[in-house]
Regions:
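Carbohydrate-associated surface elements
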Residues: 148, 166
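Nucleotide-activated donor-binding/catalytic signature segment of Leloir-type glycosyltransferases, i.e.
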Residues: 238-273
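C-terminal alpha-helical cap of glycosyltransferases
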Residues: 353, 379-407
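Conserved donor-binding/catalytic core segment of Leloir-type glycosyltransferases
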Residues: 187-206, 212-215, 228-229
Length: 407
């Protein structure tokens, strides 16, 4: 008996080629839905201008999805896609419009016109910012991708569906470290920490200053250590990573992926090489609705240092696949919530623990990290066991058991 795949969905998010965490997660979910027969399209408020275009799955990644295409609609006038959700949704004849983004950016004048708006959103602050709560009022259903977010939504009276983010473990997997370092032009005889993330603001949300200060403490004790940054550097609003590294006297021990390559020529396969070149990923963000890099790195067999707040502790097994640094203080922000600033001393102490863990038994660390991700964050399992049942039930709710619309 053929599977029923009548539900049409539009997803407001980054284009799948945009090299962001959102674009990677959407790529991994939506092409699997296309493979399963679901009609989907993307309203790409980031990554596409001009007109609609069909975009194929990247040919150098998972060969299983070669030649599958997804229609991408371009950004219209509103910077975060509120107008596109409405107008592109009508053009695609979408039964439901999803978003994967920070919904505080969305315009309620468009949300109010969308009958079935379903945000799959990050909750990355406590309390939930009021501008997020206001937009949730327009949702037909609410979805979140962390247990932290699910619990906080419940405390605020919102029922939600929790489906965690996941990663493609056929792309992110262990490789030979020496070959990865050779490919990236990195020294072989160092204990290497890596940071991967956006550098959009100052103070930096990804915790760059705290991580650099922690690395200074670590490097003073272990001069054979080094650090690699995959970020973008050049803008007045960004945190001056290189300058701060030089200020602390670490310039000869810190390496950077080329800025242009970081922005435009980095895809999941090249980032997997970076994870495999390192020994430990540093990810002590000030706010985090999930933290995709943390599970990608562990899928490659690398332990991760996070901060003990928001979603981040959910992503590791403390003492086995990573460590959680403590918060130094919370900073009150204009959205009437808090960001958490990690203690550099605590990050350093976690670096010491991770160093000892890797040095003692690197093969066990690699195995433990990878199995944790395969068992809990494998995107194939999540699509099969979470997304397909959710969409099948939504299809019945909206179209009826026989395909006739209930609206």
């Amino acid at each position: 008996m053929p599977k029923r795949r009548e539900l049409r969905t539009l997803w407001n998010t980054n284009g799948i080629f945009a090299n962001s965490g959102y674009s990677i997660e959407m790529r991994d979910i939506l092409y699997r839905l296309v493979e399963d027969g679901w009609p989907v399209a993307i309203s790409a408020f980031s990554g596409l201008d001009g007109g609609p275009t069909d975009i194929a799955y990247p040919s150098q990644l998972n060969p299983r999805f070669k030649n599958l295409i997804i229609k991408h609609y371009p950004r219209m006038g509103e910077p975060y896609g509120s107008d596109g959700m409405y107008f592109h949704g009508r053009d695609f004849k979408a039964n439901a419009v999803f978003s994967m983004q920070d919904i505080w950016t969305l315009d309620p004048s468009f949300l109010s016109k969308i009958p079935v708006f379903i945000p799959w959103l990050p909750i990355d602050k406590e309390p939930i910012p009021i501008n997020v709560v206001q937009k949730l009022m327009f949702a037909y259903k609410i979805m979140c991708f962390s247990k932290f977010g699910y619990d906080l939504l419940a405390e605020n009276g919102f029922a939600s569906t929790f489906i965690t983010e996941g990663t493609d473990v056929e792309i992110f997997k262990p490789q030979n470290q020496a070959e990865a370092r050779k490919k990236l032009g990195l020294p072989q005889n160092v204990f290497l920490f890596l940071m991967v993330g956006a550098n959009k603001e100052n103070p930096p949300r990804k915790g760059y200053q705290e991580a650099i200060e922690a690395f200074k403490m670590f490097h003073d004790k272990y001069p054979e250590s080094a650090m690699l940054f995959h970020i973008q550097q050049r803008a007045p609003t960004m945190f001056p990573v290189k300058e701060y590294v030089n200020y602390l006297g670490l310039g000869g021990n810190v390496f950077y992926l080329d800025d242009y390559r970081s922005m435009f020529n980095s895809t999941s396969d090249t980032i997997a090489t970076e994870y495999n070149a390192c020994d430990v990923l540093l990810h002590p963000s000030q706010t985090e609705g999930f933290g995709l890099c943390a599970i990608e790195a562990q899928a490659c067999g690398k332990p991760v240092i996070v901060q003990r707040c928001q979603s981040m502790p959910e992503l590791i097994i403390e003492g086995k696949t990573g460590f959680a640094a403590e918060t130094l203080y919370k900073r009150f922000t204009s959205d009437l919530s808090f960001v958490n600033v990690a203690s550099p001393k605590s990050v350093y102490e976690c670096m010491e623990k991770a160093y000892a863990l890797v040095k003692e038994n690197p093969n066990k660390v690699e195995y433990d990290c990878r199995q944790w991700i395969i068992n809990n964050f494998n995107i194939d399992t999540l699509v099969k066991e979470k997304w397909l049942p959710f969409l099948s039930q939504l299809q019945i709710d909206l179209l009826g058991p026989d395909g006739a619309s209930l609206g």
